[in-house]
C-alpha cells in the first residue's frame, strides 16, 4: 500500500490533500477557480512553490504547444535551478529543464489577460490574495485539465523517481488539454497583436 501511495500521490500527506481537494470540488467550493473566460487569456502562468519542479515542467511543456507562457514560485528565490531528480525525470519525458531558472513573485510582472495555473488549492487562494481586486486575470487549478481531474498535484520535490514521473505525466496531460482551451494565448497571436498596436 505504501509503495502505491508513494508512486501515485507522493506521500500519505499527498493522498490526504488530494482527497480533501476532491471533496472541495464535489461540494462546489472550487468553482471560483474554474476557467470562465478562456477567450480573454493572453498568457498561461504556471505557479507552484519553488518554480523548479512542477511549474518549471509545465512551462517548458507549454512552449511545445506554442503558448505564450511564464512561471513563478510562491516561495522561492529568482535564479534557482531545478534539482537533479527533476532534471532526470524531465529528461525521461523528453524535456530539457537545464536552462530553466526560477522566478519569485516580487520579480514577476502581472499582465492583463494572465491565467494563473496553480498546483494546489491553497496556492489558488494565495495567488488570489496577492492579486487583490484585479479582475483582468484568472486563477485556475492546472489539475482540472487532467483526466480524471486532479485538483491537487502534490509537490514531487525530495520524493522518489516513480512519483516524479507520475507527477510530470499528469502535468503533461493537463498542459496538452489546456492548450486546446486557450485560443488567444498563442505566441504568434500575441506577437501579431503587439504588431498591430505598434502601427
Question: Where in the sequence are the language-model features?
Answer:
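Phosphate-binding/catalytic loops
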Residues: 1-38, 128-199
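Conserved active-site segments centered on acidic
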Residues: 9-112, 181-189, 195
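Short beta-strand scaffold positions
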Residues: 118-119
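Alpha-helix capping/helix-boundary segments
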Residues: 123-124
Amino acid at each position: 500500500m505504501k509503495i502505491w501511495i508513494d508512486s501515485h500521490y507522493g506521500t500519505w500527506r499527498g493522498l490526504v490533500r488530494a482527497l480533501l481537494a476532491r471533496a472541495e470540488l464535489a461540494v462546489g467550493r472550487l468553482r471560483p477557480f474554474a476557467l470562465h473566460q478562456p477567450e480573454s487569456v493572453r498568457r498561461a502562468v504556471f505557479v507552484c512553490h519553488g518554480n523548479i519542479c512542477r511549474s518549471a515542467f509545465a512551462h517548458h511543456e507549454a512552449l511545445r504547444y506554442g503558448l505564450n507562457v511564464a512561471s513563478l514560485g510562491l516561495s522561492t528565490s529568482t535564479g534557482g535551478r531545478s534539482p537533479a531528480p527533476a532534471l532526470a525525470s524531465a529528461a525521461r519525458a523528453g524535456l530539457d529543464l537545464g536552462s530553466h531558472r526560477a522566478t519569485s513573485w516580487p520579480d514577476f510582472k502581472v499582465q492583463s489577460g494572465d491565467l494563473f495555473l496553480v498546483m494546489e488549492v491553497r496556492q489558488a487562494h494565495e495567488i488570489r490574495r496577492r492579486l487583490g481586486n484585479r479582475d483582468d486575470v484568472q486563477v485556475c487549478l492546472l489539475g482540472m485539465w487532467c483526466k480524471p481531474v486532479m485538483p491537487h498535484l502534490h509537490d514531487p520535490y525530495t520524493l522518489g523517481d516513480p512519483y516524479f514521473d507520475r507527477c510530470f505525466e499528469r502535468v503533461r496531460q493537463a498542459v496538452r488539454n489546456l492548450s486546446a482551451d486557450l485560443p488567444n494565448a498563442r505566441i504568434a497571436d500575441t506577437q501579431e497583436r503587439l504588431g498591430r498596436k505598434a502601427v
